[in-house]
Each structure stands twice: as structure tokens, then as C-alpha cells.
Amino acid sequence: MSLFSLWVMAFGLSMDAFAVSICKGLAMEKFQWCGALKAGLYFGLFQAVMPLIGFLLGVQFSEYITDYDHWVAFFLLALIGVNMLRESLSDEDDEDSCSNDFNFKTMMTLGFATSIDALAVGVTFAFLSVDIYSSVVTIGLITAALSIIGVKSGHFLGKKIKTKAEILGGLILIGLGVKILMEHTLFG
């Protein structure tokens, strides 16, 4: 996977955390850097650890599905992307994600919930030529930075950004899935 593709994937994966961070910022009466840094730490750490776990699981099963790995990568990324689009267009809103509470339990729950997609992407990494350690660091750092920016911008800009971020993230992941499939079927 090229560095550009990795950055695009990291950006796409970080959109759930970014959207929740915007909600956190919206709930703040007064902006607090401590809350923004906590969001960056929790979301960045979860987004880094989950693909590593997914990668390790994928490596365990890669010998059984090597002939179909590009299809697995495509379907996982497309499924995640479509789910992100569906969630962004629904009227449902998660009250916990939009509270101004940055306690351990809340942030652990949100960190896990926003990184499930990263676990599935980690499985796809097992089938691609990916330096897993630099990949998870890149994903974690980009997510941390965007989460901090999300809290800050949510505090100042309002609700309009949240849905657009989720739509963009979903489209990016679907696009990457199509790219992987095309590379292996048309050009591979």
C-alpha cells in the first residue's frame, strides 16, 4: 500500500472519531483543551490498536483465504463505508457521544465503538503489503490530531460538519475498497 493510500485510509477511518469529537465540542459550554486532548488520546490509541489486532487475526487465517484476499478487503471496506454512509444519513443521534463527559468509562466506550471499523481494516492489512507498525502509528496520529481538531471545531462551528465528515469517511473507504479490487482483478 502506498503512503498516499495509507494516509487516505487513515483519514477515512478517523471520520467516526472526528464526528464524535465534534459532538463533544458541541456539548462544551466553554472550550477546554483537556477534553480535546483526552479525545485525541483515546480515539488515537483505539484507532491504532484495533487495526493491529485485526492484522494479527488476519495473519492467522490468511493461508486459508489467500486466493480471495482482495475480495475480502473489498467487501470489508465497502461494508464499512456503506455503514458509515447509512449512519450519517439517519436521523438517529447517540446521546452519549454528544455529552460533554470525558470520563474514563465514556471515552473507553466511545473509543471502542469508533474503532470497530479499524479492526476490520486491520484484517485487510494482512492481505496487503503493509508495514503494520508504521500504518498503525500513522492511523493513530491522524485520528488523534483530527479528534482534537474535531472537539475544537465542534465547539465553534456547530452541527453541520458532523454529517459531512461521516459521509466523506464512508466514501473514502468504499473508494479504497474499489481501488484494491481493481488492482487485483484488472491490473494484478
Swiss-Prot record:
GO cellular component, as recorded: plasma membrane
Q: Which PANTHER family match?
A: MANGANESE EFFLUX PUMP MNTP-RELATED
Q: Which domain of life is it from?
A: Bacteria
Q: How does it sit in the membrane?
A: Multi-pass membrane protein
A Pfam family the protein falls into? Mntp
Q: What is its main location?
A: membrane
By its UniProt entry, which HAMAP family does this protein fall under? MntP_pump
Tell me the GO molecular function terms.
manganese ion transmembrane transporter activity
**What's this protein's family per the entry?**
Belongs to the MntP (TC 9.B.29) family.
How is this protein named in the record? Putative manganese efflux pump MntP
Q: Which organism is it from?
A: Mannheimia succiniciproducens (strain KCTC 0769BP / MBEL55E)
Among InterPro entries, the record links this protein to: Mntp/YtaF, Put_MntP
Question: TM segments?
Answer: 3-23, 39-59, 65-85, 110-130, 131-151, 167-187
> Where does this polypeptide localize?
Cell inner membrane
